[in-house]
């Protein structure tokens, strides 16, 4: 499906990197405009709806996202990236996993702090200087980068190109800390 929909795609990489897959299994996208390198190189990383492996459900699930993104979290499954060659697709897969680790750490430390819309716009305008010709869009503030560049708080969503993202709410952090503490104590 990737090759049919976009002529610039010459390679796909699919894997189950643990942190990115954890986000996919928890129902969270990686679309907040937080890390300049990711905004510059990938834009955002949406969570696609669940599809049963081996059939047409996964290609059907990613189809609505292919024109706007190069990296995807596959709900309850893993990660898929596309690129101009195998090295480009692999680099994007590695970048997705690194961003997932950074995002998880930021959320555990109290929440992500998004880049301002003017700063996001500046990064998008810098893409040609770095040889990045594709323009992706911010699902939270749109192409014009007006408004907040972060996902609205609330329950994660997995349907549609504007899928939600974890908000790093204090109650969530507290629950995680309590669970980790309990598990550590069990091991002592």
Label the model's feature ranges.
Residues 1-188:
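Glycine-rich flexible loops
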């Amino acid at each position: 499906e990737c090759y049919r929909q976009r002529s610039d795609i010459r390679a796909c990489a699919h894997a189950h990197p643990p942190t990115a897959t954890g986000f996919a299994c928890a129902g969270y996208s990686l679309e907040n405009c937080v890390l300049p390198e990711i905004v510059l190189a990938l834009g955002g990383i949406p969570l696609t709806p669940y599809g049963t492996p081996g059939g047409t459900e996964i290609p059907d699930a990613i189809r609505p996202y292919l024109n706007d993104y190069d990296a995807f979290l596959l709900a309850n499954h893993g990660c898929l990236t596309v690129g101009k060659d195998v090295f480009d697709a692999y680099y994007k897969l590695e970048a997705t996993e690194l961003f997932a680790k950074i995002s998880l750490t930021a959320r555990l430390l109290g929440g992500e702090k998004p880049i301002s819309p003017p700063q996001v716009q500046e990064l998008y305008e810098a893409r040609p200087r770095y040889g990045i010709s594709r323009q992706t869009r911010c699902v939270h503030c749109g192409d014009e980068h007006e408004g907040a560049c972060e996902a609205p708080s609330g329950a994660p969503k997995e349907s549609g190109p504007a899928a939600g993202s974890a908000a790093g709410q204090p109650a969530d952090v507290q629950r995680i800390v309590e669970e980790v503490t309990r598990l550590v104590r069990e091991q002592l």
